[in-house]
């Protein structure tokens, strides 16, 4: 499972011009699910991201998690993160989970983030989404489990 996290001052996702999720300061999480992933992977990645220290403390060092910063979370499914881009001019998605598996694990991941006490907003699974964000920093990390 892959989480591309971006520290944002705000972010929103729309589908067909309908706002489906928006947050203020917090994390935008683009989530890629691979066929080898399971519920334990989702729980582990959620725990790791919720506690990953990417927010500044009073000394301007990255010592605070999104929990510490009392931030919000916007989770957007993105199967393209599971692409193999090592060869050729077209990505291979052979390691991506099936849509049913990915949707289930996406939901489990979101539930696990909420269980950490975080306000969680989401995109719409498998929809053609427009994501707008203001990356704070910019700060972007890729986490894998």
From Swiss-Prot:
A Gene Ontology term for the protein's cellular component: cytoplasm
GO terms under biological process: D-amino acid catabolic process
EC number(s) reported in the record: 3.1.1.96
Gene3D superfamilies hit by this protein: D-tyrosyl-tRNA(Tyr) deacylase
Pfam family, one: Tyr_Deacylase
Annotated catalysed reactions: glycyl-tRNA(Ala) + H2O = tRNA(Ala) + glycine + H(+); a D-aminoacyl-tRNA + H2O = a tRNA + a D-alpha-amino acid + H(+)
Enzyme class: hydrolase
Domain of life of the native organism: Bacteria
Places the protein is found: Cytoplasm
Sorted UniProt keywords: Cytoplasm, Hydrolase, RNA-binding, tRNA-binding
Entries under SUPFAM superfamilies matching the protein: DTD-like (SSF69500)
The keyword Transmembrane helix is assigned to this record: no
Motif (Gly-cisPro motif, important for rejection of L-amino acids): 137-138
InterPro entries in alphabetical order: Daa-tRNA_deacyls_DTD, DTD-like_sf
A GO molecular-function annotation: Gly-tRNA(Ala) deacylase activity
UniProt record similarity statement: Belongs to the DTD family.
Domain text: A Gly-cisPro motif from one monomer fits into the active site of the other monomer to allow specific chiral rejection of L-amino acids.
Protein role: An aminoacyl-tRNA editing enzyme that deacylates mischarged D-aminoacyl-tRNAs. Also deacylates mischarged glycyl-tRNA(Ala), protecting cells against glycine mischarging by AlaRS. Acts via tRNA-based rather than protein-based catalysis; rejects L-amino acids rather than detecting D-amino acids in the active site. By recycling D-aminoacyl-tRNA to D-amino acids and free tRNA molecules, this enzyme counteracts the toxicity associated with the formation of D-aminoacyl-tRNA entities in vivo and helps enforce protein L-homochirality.
NCBIfam families per record: D-aminoacyl-tRNA deacylase
Subunit field text: Homodimer.
Name used for this protein in its record: D-aminoacyl-tRNA deacylase
UniProt source species: Idiomarina loihiensis (strain ATCC BAA-735 / DSM 15497 / L2-TR)
Gene name of this polypeptide: dtd
């Amino acid at each position: 499972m892959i989480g591309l996290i971006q520290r944002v001052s705000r972010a929103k996702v729309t589908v067909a011009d309908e706002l489906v999720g928006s947050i203020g300061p917090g994390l935008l999480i683009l989530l890629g699910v691979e066929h080898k992933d399971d519920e334990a992977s989702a729980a582990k990645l959620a725990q790791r991201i919720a506690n990953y220290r990417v927010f500044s403390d009073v000394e301007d060092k990255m010592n605070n998690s999104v929990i510490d910063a009392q931030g919000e979370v916007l989770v957007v499914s993105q199967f393209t993160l599971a692409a193999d881009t090592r060869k050729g001019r077209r990505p291979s998605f052979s390691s991506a989970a099936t849509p049913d598996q990915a949707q289930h694990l996406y939901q489990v991941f979101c539930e696990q983030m909420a269980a950490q006490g975080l306000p969680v907003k989401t995109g719409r699974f498998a929809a053609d989404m427009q994501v707008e964000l203001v990356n704070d920093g910019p700060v972007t990390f890729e986490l894998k489990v």
